[in-house]
Amino acid sequence: MTDPTSFAAAWIADWNAHDVEKILSHYAEDVVFHSPNSALRTKGEKTFFTSREELRPYFNFAFHIRPHLRFTLLNFCQDRQGLALIYQDETGATATELMDLNQLGQVVFARVLYDR
């Protein structure tokens, strides 16, 4: 099992650095990624993504529309399959990202939940 403290710290740091390639390195090539923002950002064309390549423009767009995007880790929970990161953004909104990890410590399934 991937060390959750190290994973969470690296994941948050890469998001805060706005380094899309480093962010994507946390995800498997064939990741399945669900977020309520998927439909909003793709004008209803996608409700989830099924690869790292599909995530690249989605993450880039997030930094384009939110140039001051910043996450603060609040907590994490773990089990044998993966972990959940609970974090807050620069606006004060809280998110929980549920992540199933493969044996390489990469996210193979993610689901993001937001408080607003």
What do the predicted segments below correspond to?
Residues 11, 23, 31, 55, ...:
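Hydrophobic pocket/interface hotspot
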